[in-house]
Each structure stands twice: as C-alpha cells, then as structure tokens.
Curated annotation (Swiss-Prot):
InterPro entries in alphabetical order: DUF3604
Keyword Signal: yes
Position of the signal peptide: 1-15
Name of this chain's protein: Uncharacterized protein CT_425
Organism: Chlamydia trachomatis serovar D (strain ATCC VR-885 / DSM 19411 / UW-3/Cx)
Lineage: Bacteria, Pseudomonadati, Chlamydiota, Chlamydiia, Chlamydiales
Homology family: Belongs to the chlamydial CPn_0512/CT_425/TC_0708 family.
Keywords: Signal
Any matching Pfam family: DUF3604
Length: 621
C-alpha cells in the first residue's frame, strides 16, 4: 500500500534559527477540491517553543500559507480549541490534487514580499531529535480527521556561544577528580557548531608548568576530563580560553582541602524546568537536571492537588525517582507540595526521609490537613519546608511552627525573597499585581520569635498558584540553588544534613560559603552553659569564594548588621570577635525560655547574586 511522502526543506534547523521552512507533502491518494487540511506545530506556547506564524499575508515576515502544485497561494485559517490559545492552521484545497503531486505548507516570508531568511519563521530554542509536525487530511472537507501524517525535523545546537565547566566544589589535595565541559549555544544547548580551527586551552590558578591541555570541540558537544588534581590547598577556578575569540570561561570556585573534607552538593528541593515538565516526562526532567544542569540532587515537587496528576502518574514519578537515585552520582528525591486551605498556613514542600512515596493520599488530599500529617509522623520521617513565606496571598505566618519537621525554610525562589521586606533592603521582593509581600511571613520576623530553621532556595515554578504569575507583571528573578554540606554523597546523608541545617541558599550561583562561631558550623545551637566563654566573646570565622567579585559580606545578628566586610576580589577569609556583653544583645524568648541570639551570613556579589548561610543560635543559660 502506497503511503504519502512527507519531508521538510531544509531537513535540519539550528535552535533559534530564523528561516523559511517548506513542508512538502506528496499524497498517496487523489485529493478532491474542497479537501480540508489541518497543520499542527505540536507546541505548548512557551517562549522556547517554535514561533507561531501569522495567517496575515499582508505582513512581510513570519507567515504561514499553502502552495498548490500549480503554485497558487492558499491562506491559512487559525483555529483555536475551546479554552486554548495555541492555534492549528486549516487550509481548503482550491483544486484537485492528483496522487503523487506535491503541495507545500510554508512557514516564513510572505509570498507578497521578497523571500529572505531574516524575515522568516523562528525555530524552537532547544534541540530535539525528529521534532514532529502533524498534517491531518479530510477529503470530505467536513473536518472528520483521522490519524495524521507526520513531518520530522532535527533541531541541533546553534553557534558556539558559551562554555560551562562543572567540577566538584570540594576536593582534597592530590586526590583525582573529573570535570565536565559543555559547549553551548546562546540558548544552553550542546553544540559543536563552530569554526573547524576552534580549540580551547585549559588553565587554572596556581597552574603547574607541565599542564598544558588543548581541547577540540567534540561532535557530542561535551567532554569529561578525568584525573585532575591540585597539589596545594586553596581556592581554584578552572579556566578555558577560546583561542579563536580570546574569550575566557571560568568555573565556579573549587575549595581544595589539605586532608579530608565533606561533600558540598548543589541542587533543588523545589523547582521545575522551563524545558521539561516533571509530571509529563519525569525521566527527561531528571536527565536535564542531572546532565545539563549538573545538579547533585533534585526533588520532585508536584502539588498534591493538581490537574492531570493521577495516582498512576505519581507512581510513575516515584518509581523513576527511585531508579535515578545513585550514590556518588545523583540523588533523586520524591516530594510533594502542600497548599493549605487554612489562612496563614502557607505552602510546604514535603520530603520523606525514608522510602519515597507520596506524602498524602491523592484522592483525599483536600481532607488531609497538615496537622494530621504531622501527628501521623515522627521527627525523622519527613522534612516539611515552608516556601514563599512572605507572600501576602499564599504565605506562612509561622504561628503553628513545628521545629521537629520544619527544619529548613525556603528563603528565596524565582518569585521573590522572603528574608525581609523591600523597605528593609530586600533586593528581590515579592512584587506584582497578583501578589506582594507580608512582613509577618519574613524569615527575620520568625527568627526573632526564636523559631529555628536553616535556609534553602527554590527554583522556578509555574504550577498551581504560580501558574498565573507568568501572564502578569509579577516580578521574576533567577532560579535559586540549595547547597548542602554532608558527609557522604548519598540520599540518607543529604537528608540528615538538611535535618541538621547544614545547608545554605543562593540566588542560583555556586558561591562557596563557610560560617562558624567558635568552630561550630552553620545550623548549630550553642549554649553559654556548655561554652561559658561565649558570654565574653563570640569568635566568628569562615570564608567565601564567589563566582564574581564580592561586594559585601555581612554578619547578621538578631536582624541587624553586626559587621560588614568589603573584599577586593572573589575570595575572602574572615574573622570577627563579637565582644559585646552577651546579656545586652540577646532577645527575649516569647515562650519564656532562655534569652537567645542568632547569627547568619549574608553575601552579595557585585553582579547582584546573593547567598545566605543558615543561622547559628546561642542561648544565654
């Protein structure tokens, strides 16, 4: 049985390329005059998707039309599904088309204007193997469409624009490690599209004289360089220099320790990819965060009440998460977001510390209050992470705080920072026509009430309550990252470190932050009963290694800035002695406990990026 022939000219596109695309269709059967055709781009309407063309042929660029075998032009009609905003395009054949004859659907310059690629139609911004386009054919002309014919096109990376270097943040002297180098276009896709003579030179601070690596861009667009090591402790950054353009690309800082060290792991406990939907394709989502973003850990964060999220989907997500979890390579966690119906109770990301499964019963979520979940759990069974706490509409007032479960709080995500208000100096306020900030939900307000939690950062979220933010003037910022300092690169060690508040938050950059008081790490609780010397002196020390020049390092005590350092560079080791009489600087505990003080570090780079260490608390006993 003869089949219709579908092909695209050109057959390969570069991500973001603007051109004229001809979808050639040679029918296996006779098509009478009046045949109805429906062309579907197969897109979701995201900014990264294929550009939607116009049916108005009076405009010179980005149009869609049909060209018959006799080269007659047929305008398209945009058709929208009920409630939809992404059109399909319909054509009615003005003449008979014999079997074997070819007509074309063209995306690009209008036929009434000069045919130039620059006035064509824009390809999607991400790579894809065999990107499908569908053509439905109804010879009756009544709209009774059956299975479509499929055009396919390969979307490849565009011109080399950026080189990203991923390396472990903590290494040990003379111990070998691997780095991954990704050659990317301006949209973050892997590419090898560059002049043939392009080669890259590798170097780093304290470079050994015998190390001189020249790299060529592989066809895959990435390369893993094994067995690097540093033979002196310190802060390093690996540099790659494009010899053709003289551009220099630098890795995030790497801290080399003299002997042993913990693991500094980067990842997301709450976030979503703009490219890959975690509910629709969890495997691709995990691969994206593991391979493209080089994260060390990722937690799913579907809302328990969400359109299209069935028990079967949850089961698939959790099984895939379990399959991807691999010690010393990638930690995958199952989590879920809980949006309370109680005023002031806010949003939680709930992580189970034991076997991954859904925290609630999907069909009964609306009847499954947070208090019931807490009553049915013990302290080491789950971690409940309040997020977006300073939101006026969806925030958390901390009135029903459970320290045994709420070990960390999300201080920042792509929709704003909850540390403090804009009037108090917050450079990333929750701001827009849909939502704004509530001072009662700020992190500092809760800390002053002697509520104790560490800091994590969330990424971008476009689901549930966040869905309408995109189509409004709601202020959006860069997705954040969470750093966790743990003993082993494993799921159990990561969750235990979160429970102990051995973590900190950044606005998305891999800034290394160390913060200690009398050698006690961030997240610690100290007492003058055990360390009487704290009454006289709180010795604060640590170091910061930025991804850019550091503008300021602020030591925060009880919401006030105790001291500010202004480093002249990307690296800085600091020491400070707080010699104020401790009894005079403590806060009163609202529950009539011991007076207390809390300290944490706030780091700001010259490029605006920030990091916040988890606090350290000191009780006056």
């Amino acid at each position: 049985m003869r089949r219709s022939v579908c092909y695209v000219t050109p057959s390969v596109a570069r991500a973001g390329q603007i051109s004229t695309w001809r979808f050639e269709y040679s029918s296996a059967n006779f098509l009478p005059e009046g045949t109805l055709l429906k062309f579907d781009l197969g897109i979701d309407g995201r900014p990264i998707d294929w550009e939607i063309p116009s049916t108005d042929l009076s405009q010179p660029c980005n149009t869609i039309y049909l060209e018959t075998p006799s080269e007659d032009i047929v305008a398209a009609k945009a058709v929208y599904a009920p409630g939809g905003y992404i059109p399909t395009f319909e054509f009615t054949l003005p003449c008979d088309v014999e079997a074997g004859d070819t007509f074309s659907i063209i995306l690009g310059s209008s036929p009434n204007f000069p045919q130039e690629d620059s006035s064509g139609n824009g390809a999607q911004l991400f790579t894809q193997r065999r990107k499908p386009f569908s053509l439905y054919v109804d010879p009756s002309g009544k709209g009774s469409f059956e299975d479509p014919d499929i055009f396919t096109m390969d979307i490849r990376g565009n011109v080399l624009k950026n080189i990203r270097i991923f390396a472990p943040s903590y290494v040990i002297k003379n111990k070998r490690f691997d780095i991954t180098v990704r050659f990317e276009d301006e949209f973050g896709n892997l590419t090898n599209f560059s002049p043939e003579e392009t080669h890259i030179e590798l170097s780093y601070e304290h470079l050994r004289e015998n190390l001189n690596w020249q790299l060529f861009i592989p066809e895959t667009g990435f390369v893993i360089l094994p067995n690097l090591y540093f033979n002196e402790p310190g802060i390093y950054r690996i540099q790659l220099r494009n010899q053709a353009t003289k551009e220099v690309f630098t890795s995030a800082p790497i801290k080399c320790f003299a002997e042993t060290s913990s693991h500094l792991l980067w990842g997301l406990l709450h976030g979503e990819s703009e490219r890959v939907d975690s509910e629709g394709n969890i495997e691709s989502c995990l691969r994206y965060f593991r391979d493209d973003c080089a994260l060390n850990f990722f937690a799913t964060s579907s809302f328990e009440i969400q359109d299209g999220l069935t028990p079967e989907t949850i089961k698939t997500i959790n099984q895939t998460v379990a399959d991807f979890n691999e010690e010393d390579r990638f930690i995958a966690l199952s989590g879920a977001q809980y949006l309370s119906e109680e005023p002031g109770e806010g949003i939680r990301e709930v992580l189970l510390m034991k076997e991954p499964k859904s925290p609630g019963k999907h069909k009964e979520c609306k009847l499954f209050p947070l208090s019931k979940l807490y009553k049915q759990s013990t302290s080491h069974e789950l971690i409940s992470i309040p997020s977006f706490t300073a939101s006026k509409k969806f925030g958390y007032n901390f009135n029903n705080f459970h320290p045994e479960f709420e070990r960390v709080v999300e201080i920042y995500n792509a929709w704003g920072c909850s540390e403090r208000t804009e009037a108090e100096g917050n450079p990333f306020p929750i701001k827009g026509s849909i939502d704004s900030e509530n001072p009662e939900g700020t992190v500092l307000s809760a800390l002053k009430r002697n509520l104790r939690f560490g800091f994590v950062a969330g990424g971008l979220d476009d689901r549930n309550l966040y869905n309408h933010f995109f189509d409004s003037d709601q202020q959006q910022y860069s997705p954040g990252l969470t750093a966790v300092i743990c003993n082993k690169y494993s799921r159990d060690s990561l969750l235990e470190a979160l429970y102990q508040r051995q973590c900190y938050a950044t606005t998305g950059q891999r800034i290394i932050v160390n913060f200690q008081i009398t050698s006690a790490p961030m997240g610690s609780e100290l007492s003058t009963a055990i360390k009487p010397g704290l009454v006289i002196n709180r010795h604060i020390s640590g170091y910061v290694a930025g991804t850019a020049k550091i503008a300021s390092i602020e030591i925060i005590r009880n919401e006030d800035i105790l001291h500010t350092f202004h480093p002249d560079g990307n690296n800085f080791e600091y020491e400070y002695d707080d010699l104020s009489p401790f009894a005079q600087v403590t806060l009163k505990d609202p529950q009539n406990g011991a007076p207390f003080a809390f300290y944490y570090l706030r780091v700001t780079q010259e490029n605006g990026a920030m990091a916040w260490s988890s606090p350290i608390w000191i009780d006056l006993n």
